[in-house]
Regions:
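Ankyrin repeat domain, specifically the short helix-to-loop turn at the C-terminus of the second helix
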Residues: 19-27, 54-64, 96-107
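Short secondary-structure capping/turn segments at boundaries of alpha-helices and beta-strands
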Residues: 25-27, 44, 91
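Surface-exposed loop/turn motifs in large extracellular/passenger domains
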Residues: 47-53, 86-100
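Generic beta-strand or strand-like secondary-structure segments
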Residues: 53, 57, 75-78
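Ankyrin-repeat boundary/"N-cap" motif
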Residues: 2-6, 29-44, 68-85, 111-126
Length: 126
């Protein structure tokens, strides 16, 4: 397994690929911004139901739910912020993702380097 394999599977929302290539390095960081697997997962769209399954797998494996990137963004920031910036997101997918992250302990009050909270990104999507 290479770091590229798991990163590619995460980016494409490939649940089976994640299962195949995941080797227990749950809090490994990717990209120059220091994204963990959960943050990387929510930077991309497509395969939404698979993405939610991957998120649950990562949570079950013990990923740090409130990990912050170098820009102080969390997975919840990425789920809501990327949806506005990069694609037209399905509201049901976003709601399911938000519920999943909050139930896993995501802090809704974390502020990124711009002072934004996940809620401020959610409001901006409307």
């Amino acid at each position: 397994m290479t770091k590229f394999d798991i990163e590619t599977a995460i980016r494409s929302g490939d649940y089976e690929g994640v299962q195949q290539h995941f080797r227990g390095h749950i809090n490994e960081e990717f990209t120059n911004d220091g994204l963990n697997l959960l943050e990387l997962l929510f930077c991309y769209s497509g395969n939404e139901s698979s993405r939610l399954r991957i998120a649950q797998l990562l949570i079950d494996e013990g990923i740090t739910i409130n990990h912050l990137t170098r820009g102080k963004s969390s997975a919840l920031h990425f789920l809501l912020g990327s949806a506005k910036a990069n694609w037209t997101a399905d509201p049901e997918y976003l709601l399911s993702g938000v519920k999943l992250l909050i139930q896993a302990g995501a802090d809704v009050n974390l502020r990124d380097v711009h002072g934004g909270t996940p809620l401020s990104y959610a409001i901006a999507m409307l």
